[in-house]
Every structure is written in structure tokens, then in C-alpha cells.
């Protein structure tokens, strides 16, 4: 999938591949018409020399009406160039929007680690800490607060994973308003 603007739509439509209804086929044809009508659209890479990764993470809490599982979404920019993105249904049902957002943050953190490693292999130094942008103040508080409560016990592994990267100075969480 090389079109980030279609990532969420394709993720939703792929759930109905084995027994599609007419509405799913019509939606798929709309996607095909969109692609056919926009053949020149692509990713824009600038020649600037900034070596910073800027990841944004988000989730859609309980988005799947059948399972109530949330959808994780993220994108990562290197300078001004979009280099990675994902839209995927989470593996388990989240009991709160903060939990869904935090699972998205953990997934994005794993991607940051991988991308930093790839860039290092290419002899490209990345500025640290990476500024991880998130629209959930609750998820950010969970990430920076070393005290774990009953409400975070079931996402304990993700909490320690993200918190460890913060303490290592690899990432820093920043709030970005939902509207941006």
C-alpha cells in the first residue's frame, strides 16, 4: 500500500474480502475510481537537511461496530517527507479511549525504534529525542507517570515499553490538539 490517504479505507474494506456485500463492492469501486483519477499523486520528498523523525499517533476508540475493537493509526515524517504510516484494527478491545490511544502510542514507538535503526544502518543520524505527537492527554500522562494503577494494569507491558524509551531519551511525548 503506497497511498497513505487510502490506508484507513483499505483497512476497513479488507475486513469484508471473504463475504463482500454490494455496498462493499461499490465502496471498492469508488477507491479504484479515485486511484484512476489521481495517477500523478505520490509522496513528496524535499531536499532539506533536517534529520528529525516526527511521528503522530491516534486511535479511533471502538471503531469496529461488530467487535468494538479500536483502530490504531500513525504516520511518521522524516523532515517534511512522509516515510511510514499505518491504519490497523487493534488486537484486543480497549476498555477506554485512553487505553486505545496508548496502544497506538506503543505501536508508534515500536515503529520509531525500527525506523531509527534503518536510518542508522544507512549512516543517517536522527535527532533525539524523537517528538512523538499524540492528541490524548490521558495517554501522555500514562506514558510519563511511573506509577501504575489498576486502570493501567492490563496495558502494563505497553506502559513499561514506552516509559523505558522516554527514560532512555529516545522519545518525548507531546500533545497536539485533535483539530490539527
Predicted regions: what they are:
Residues 3, 58, 135:
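Short, conserved phosphate/pyrophosphate- and ester-handling motifs at nucleotide-, phospho-/glycolipid
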Residues 10, 65-67, 142-144:
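Active-site-proximal flexible loops/turns
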Residues 16, 30, 44, 51-52, ...:
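RNase H-like nuclease module associated with reverse transcription
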Residues 1-42, 177-179:
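C-terminal reverse transcriptase regions that engage the nucleic-acid substrate
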Residues 34-57:
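Structured nucleic-acid-interacting core domains from mobile-element enzymes and related host factors
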Residues 17, 35, 39-42, 63, ...:
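Structural motif corresponding to the C-terminal cap of alpha-helices
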Residues 60, 64-80:
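Acidic, metal-ligating active-site segments
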Amino acid at each position: 500500500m503506497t497511498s497513505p490517504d487510502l490506508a484507513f479505507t483499505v483497512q476497513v474494506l479488507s475486513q469484508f474480502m471473504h463475504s463482500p456485500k454490494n455496498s462493499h463492492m461499490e465502496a471498492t469501486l469508488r477507491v479504484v475510481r479515485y486511484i484512476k483519477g489521481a495517477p500523478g499523486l505520490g509522496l513528496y520528498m524535499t531536499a532539506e537537511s533536517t534529520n528529525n523523525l516526527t511521528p503522530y499517533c491516534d486511535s479511533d476508540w471502538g471503531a469496529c461496530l461488530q467487535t468494538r475493537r479500536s483502530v490504531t493509526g500513525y504516520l511518521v515524517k522524516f523532515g517534511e517527507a512522509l516515510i511510514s504510516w499505518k491504519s490497523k484494527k487493534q488486537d484486543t478491545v480497549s476498555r477506554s479511549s485512553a487505553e486505545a490511544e496508548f496502544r497506538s502510542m506503543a505501536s508508534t514507538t515500536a515503529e520509531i525504534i525500527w525506523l531509527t535503526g534503518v536510518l542508522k544502518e544507512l549512516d543517517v543520524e536522527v535527532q533525539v529525542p524523537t517528538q512523538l505527537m499524540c492528541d490524548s492527554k490521558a495517554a501522555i500522562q500514562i506514558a510519563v507517570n511511573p506509577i501504575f494503577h489498576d486502570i493501567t494494569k492490563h496495558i502494563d507491558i505497553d506502559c513499561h515499553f514506552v516509559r523505558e524509551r522516554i527514560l532512555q531519551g529516545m522519545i518525548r511525548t507531546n500533545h497536539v490538539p485533535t483539530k490539527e
